[in-house]
Amino acid sequence: MPQYASRDVGDPSQIKKNKQSMADLKLRRLTELNNRLREDLERERIPVSQAAKSIITYCNSTRDYMVPSVWGPVPKSEDPYLPQQSSGCCVVM
């Protein structure tokens, strides 16, 4: 019959500390999850139809210079993407 040796499991107070630290870790994780869920719950919500209407209104009222096929050609004086011309005669590099 084989001989079984007893295992040294260590100091019982150390085992208790490890279990306590694991419990503290679980509690902290649950608390953080609870806080995130509370923040989600407090976030303002609007119906999808209202959000879609708001986006459509914005797109119809805001001129997009990158889509000239919809808004027509952009006058040079209004083009924000046109390189700015310097008023001086010299450029220092």
From Swiss-Prot:
Subcellular location: Membrane
Gene3D superfamilies in alphabetical order: Transducin (heterotrimeric G protein), gamma chain
Removed propeptide positions: 91-93
Lipidation (S-palmitoyl cysteine): C89
Gene Ontology biological-process annotations: G protein-coupled receptor signaling pathway; pheromone-dependent signal transduction involved in conjugation with cellular fusion
Membrane topology summary: Peripheral membrane protein
Disordered, as annotated region: 1-22
Subcellular location, principal: membrane
Keyword field contains Membrane: yes
Record PROSITE patterns: G_PROTEIN_GAMMA
Family the entry assigns: Belongs to the G protein gamma family.
Protein name: Guanine nucleotide-binding protein subunit gamma
The organism of origin for this protein: Neurospora crassa (strain ATCC 24698 / 74-OR23-1A / CBS 708.71 / DSM 1257 / FGSC 987)
